UniProtKB/Swiss-Prot annotation:
<keyword id="KW-0812">Transmembrane</keyword>
<protein>
    <recommendedName>
        <fullName>Outer membrane protein P2</fullName>
    </recommendedName>
</protein>
<keyword id="KW-0813">Transport</keyword>
<keyword id="KW-0732">Signal</keyword>
<keyword id="KW-0472">Membrane</keyword>
<keyword id="KW-0626">Porin</keyword>
<dbReference type="GO" id="GO:0006811">
    <property type="term" value="P:monoatomic ion transport"/>
</dbReference>
<dbReference type="InterPro" id="IPR033900">
    <property type="entry name" value="Gram_neg_porin_domain"/>
</dbReference>
<keyword id="KW-0406">Ion transport</keyword>
<comment type="subunit">
    <text>Homotrimer.</text>
</comment>
<keyword id="KW-1134">Transmembrane beta strand</keyword>
<dbReference type="GO" id="GO:0015288">
    <property type="term" value="F:porin activity"/>
</dbReference>
<comment type="function">
    <text>Forms pores that allow passive diffusion of small molecules across the outer membrane.</text>
</comment>
<dbReference type="InterPro" id="IPR023614">
    <property type="entry name" value="Porin_dom_sf"/>
</dbReference>
<keyword id="KW-0998">Cell outer membrane</keyword>
<dbReference type="GO" id="GO:0009279">
    <property type="term" value="C:cell outer membrane"/>
</dbReference>
<dbReference type="GO" id="GO:0046930">
    <property type="term" value="C:pore complex"/>
</dbReference>
Length: 385
């Protein structure tokens, strides 16, 4: 059987959800447990102006566990709670295999109705998360969160009930601050509870995705504001906290599935404009240096494909060209390519081999051009439960 379009796009998340075990189902209440253990052995290297580092590793690659509880009220109304963890700490450098403390990736509650849509509150994915179509298991060359945040502390609304337009999803999200200055010892002892500098202060995004009749089309727009350091947090510019103030971004995708061939071709793209504010550095009471405001523009295009080579075996890949320019003269161009093959050994066991290569050139006024290269190849195994 040819692979369905949903399976081609949703990928591993859909697989983990499909393999979840129902541990309780009674009187309108359903509880599911699921997850996966993921291990990859890899070889990677990076080269920047003839300086090379090579790394071989056997490590965790996104192992996770989730629990979902759904309560049906009748007349199409329902409530849902969802918790998903990762088996990796916030400080992976302390453990080269990337296994660490269990952390919360998503935790949210949902109130909804099949006819009117649903409202989601908590740490969750946003409408921007599922916009692009490119497939990858580990080395994805697209970095969508630089354009629009794909998850966070959010209040979101999703609607799927438009008559005659099955496959159309409309969504909107409002992002709230998630990172705040903690209590106790801190570089900012008098700012406890305030949004941490250069972290998301608030944001809004809207989007739509159509996935039916062999056609895929989606677009999302987001405006995200970041907490500025300013004189309150860094009056003399000593901490180097960054100057990001606001990002406006767009992500889009367009694809078509040739169902008779088991082939999906797609084109992803994005554009973002980042505003950086003016700062004043002072090394002494009598001397100040003003860093003027500037804008950074970023864009990419990425054609890709997903093809069912044979039953339970799929080939996928994509190419990306990305350009970043600053109105002060600095420009960066990146070309990247990814290719992979996956095979199901069992309905709950997936193995794959994936490789990626990226080449980056950076030009700045009065400076020598810098070239960077990254190469990665890995063989992975996922066991779902």
């Amino acid at each position: 059987m040819k692979k369905t379009l949903a399976a081609l796009i949703v990928g591993a998340f859909a697989a983990s959800a499909a393999n979840a075990a129902v541990v309780y189902n009674n009187e309108g209440t359903n509880v599911e447990l699921g997850g996966r253990l993921s291990i990859i052995t890899e070889q990677s290297n990076s080269t920047v102006d003839d300086q090379e580092q090579q790394h071989g590793a056997l490590r965790n690659a996104g192992s996770r566990f989730h629990i979902k509880a759904t309560h049906n009220f009748g007349d199409g109304f329902y409530a849902q709670g969802y918790l998903e963890t990762r088996l990796v700490s916030d400080y992976p450098e302390s453990s080269s295999d990337h296994f660490g403390g269990i952390t919360t990736k998503y935790a949210y509650v949902t109130l909804g109705n099949k006819a009117f849509g649903e409202v989601k509150l908590g740490r969750a994915k946003t409408i921007a998360d599922g916009i692009t179509s490119a497939e990858d298991k580990e080395y994805g060359v697209l970095n969508n969160k630089k354009y629009i945040p794909t998850n966070g502390n959010t209040v979101g609304y999703t609607y799927k009930g438009i008559d005659g337009l099955d496959g159309l999803v409309l969504g909107a999200n409002y992002l709230l601050a998630q990172s705040r200055v903690p209590g106790g010892p801190s570089p900012f002892p008098r700012k406890q509870g305030e949004v941490y500098p250069q972290q998301i202060s608030n944001g809004v995004q809207v989007g739509a995705k159509y996935d039916a009749n062999n056609i895929i089309a989606g677009i999302a727009f987001g405006r995200t504001n970041y907490k500025t350091a300013g004189a309150d947090f860094d009056p003399y510019g000593d901490f180097g906290l960054g100057r990001k103030e606001q990002v406006e971004g767009v992500l889009s995708t367009l694809g078509y599935r040739f169902s008779d061939l088991g082939l999906l071709v797609s084109l992803d793209s994005g554009y973002a404009k980042t505003k950086y504010y003016t700062t004043t550095d002072s090394s002494s009471g009598s001397q100040t240096i003003t860093n003027p405001a500037y804008d950074e523009k970023r864009s990419f295009v990425s054609p890709g494909f997903q093809y069912e080579l044979m039953e339970d075996t799929n080939v996928y890949g994509n190419f990306k060209y990305e350009r970043t320019s600053v109105n002060q003269g600095k420009n960066t161009r990146e070309q990247a390519v990814l290719f992979g093959v996956d095979h199901k050994l069992h309905k709950q066991v997936l193995t794959y081999i994936e490789g990626a290569y990226a080449r980056t050139k950076t030009n700045d006024k009065g400076k020598t051009e810098k070239t960077g290269k990254e190469k990665s190849v890995g063989v992975g195994l996922r066991v779902y439960f």
